[in-house]
């Protein structure tokens, strides 16, 4: 991802509806995991997820590949390690949790990253993974933020399972707004990562929050979430 895109992400993620609800989703997953331990946040970027981990009692290690992203994280008070998800600089079996939100789609050899996530987890440890869904939504936005692919359920579960993890759940997110996203990106000429009018931001946040209470997780969405464990 270009340095300018990373800077924009850091500027908007604290207030942007999409990032706020994604952090809420992470928090709900953390509450169901039980006793906190040592966690790795791959692709920490602006540090939003790292702060959620810390707030819930986890001891997070933030990892970034891009120098600009690592610098941004440090500027925001996050201790970050430079490293490659395909060759994690951590001991085998040393972690209780790995989060990788919007990471795998940037990596050509995503299967190597999946195997590394498995390697660094202890037996019984959990991986929480989020990726963009459905190549039908491919657009100039994906190209602008250096995506290699978008995933369907079978493709994502195959990569993670071959890496050695046991899948516990896979679900769609940002389902209700998928038609809006598809329409906008059809005519887009670049990244749609930008600030949002406060009134519109509040409305979009209300819509995506409503998904928590609706039976839509099996329907097509904009993002796929996956929870898995190391056997």
Regions found by a protein language model. Give the residues of each.
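Residues lining the SAM
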Residues: 101-104, 130
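C-terminal helical/coil "lid" or tail adjacent to the Rossmann-like core of SAM-dependent
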Residues: 177-205
